[in-house]
Each structure stands twice: as structure tokens, then as C-alpha cells.
Amino acid sequence: KIERKKMSLWGRVGVLIFLIVVLIFAFIPYIGIGLDSFGRGWALTPIPVKYTLQYFERVSIETPKFIINSLLYSGISVFICIIVGVPVAWVMARTKVPGRDLLDSLTTLILALPGTGIGIAYMRAFRDPLPFMNTALLGMWIVIPIVLGVRRLPYTVRGTFASLLIVHKSFEEAAESVGAPKMKTFKDVTLPLIWKGVLVGSLYSFILALQEASATLLLVVPGHEMMTVGIFNFYIGGSVNEAAALGFILIILGTVCLFAISKLAGTKMGGVFG
């Protein structure tokens, strides 16, 4: 039996100081990005003496492609995750077909593969023209959402799989017993019960697709760069404030998605991670 022991006053003070120090170090990067993205005048002070929105205007008006491409390609990758991940999760949870355990292992193994490794693998696999096309997939923009979908597939699969385990098979069996085909049973019975889990897993995939840098840096097509590539380009070009502004927008998008996940999951934002 686990018993709680009351800490001494100095013990509580020590723990509080330790947590404050850890939180300060954890939030320093975010504070720095915020100051760089809004700050204009620095007079040898730790914080800016003037603030501006001109860096946000530049990244959102002069170079909006980074934001548009990120939202578009991440959205397409989530669509790929749902189309592939939901059937995979259903096979794993509802069937006894041979090889489903191997399918589970292969899906999870994707998380162990580094983004640079997947990027190099795609470069070698699709550098030659496709049989039915005169161009290689490597030179097309569609390769970016494909690799993003593959990289984030496990999150959609896990979210759907967990929801399927909660829904008892008797609901589906009752529908099938009155003559409903499996597809209709899934659409009318199962899907309405698991849609929150599918959506939560998909939002996780969307957040991580937005933040993907390693694979997209290798597979980037000129004119189709995402926000992470835009941040890199601004930084190496000496436009640190614009890079910070783009990073701040990325943080806001991720925060909004996490808030949506917490609402769907019915828990606080911190509880989303277990």
C-alpha cells in the first residue's frame, strides 16, 4: 500500500524552488522566440525597448507560402493517416487474420525510424521516373504529404485502436445479426462511437506533421517549402526575427491543436499526455 508522507517545510520549499527553476529553463526558448518575433529595438537590455508586428507581416503577407503549404500538406497527410490508419486499426482490433501482430509491429516500428533515414530512403526509392509518368515522384510536391503521412501514421492507428477496444463487439454483432453488411455496420455503428479517438489521433498527427523538419528538409521541392524549412531559410539568411515570427506562429498552431485535443478527450491539456 502506498502511503503519502508529509514533507517538512524546508522540503516543500526545496521542491518548489526546483520546479520553478525547471519551468524557467523549459520556457526560456519560448520566451526568446516571443521576444525576437515582437522585439524591434534592443538598447543593451535583456528585453526589447520597442515592439513591432512587421516581422509577422512579412512572413504572412510577403511569404505566406510557408504557412499555406504547412497547413495544406499536413492536412493531406492526416487524410492519408485516416484512410490507411483506421482500416489498419480495425484489422488489429476486430479480426484474427494471420499477420495482424506483425502489422502492429511494423506500424509501431515507424516511430523508431529517424526522419533523415526515411527522407534518404524516399530519395533513393523515387528518384527515377514512375512507369506511368515522365517525372520522378521525388520532384513532385505530393511526396511531402506522403512522407508526413507515413511518419505520423502510428498516432492515428493508436488513437483508433484504443477507441475500438473500448467499444464492445456486441454492438457490431447486433447490427450484423439483422443483416447489416460489415461496411454499413462500421459506418453506422462503429464510426459514430470511435470518431473522437480517430480525431484525437489525427490531430496528434497534424501537430507533428506541422513540426516535421528532418524529412522535409531532404525532400523539399522549390516553391513548396513548409514552415520548418522557412524558419531554416530565414535563419541562415540572417533574418532571425522573421524566423522567430514564423516559429511563434507554429507554436500558436500547435497550442490550438492541443487545446482541441484536450476538449475532445475531456481532460486538461496536461492530461492529454497521460
Locations of regions flagged by a protein language model:
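Loop-to-helix entry region at the N-terminal start of transmembrane alpha-helices
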Residues: 15, 20, 62-74, 112, ...
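Interhelical loop and adjacent transmembrane-helix boundary motif
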Residues: 6-11, 37-44, 50-65, 210, ...
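C-terminal transmembrane helix and the adjacent membrane-cytosol boundary/short C-terminal tail
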Residues: 1-6, 90-91, 99, 161-172, ...
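Transmembrane alpha-helices
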Residues: 17-30, 102, 109, 150, ...
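Cytoplasmic-entry segments and transmembrane alpha-helices of multi-pass inner-membrane transporters
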Residues: 8-16, 87-122
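Transmembrane alpha-helix signature in integral membrane proteins
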Residues: 61-94, 99
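Membrane-embedded alpha-helices of multi-pass transport/permease systems
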Residues: 28-31, 35-38, 83-88, 120, ...
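Membrane-interfacial helix termini and adjacent extracytoplasmic/periplasmic loops
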Residues: 1-7, 40, 44-53, 61, ...
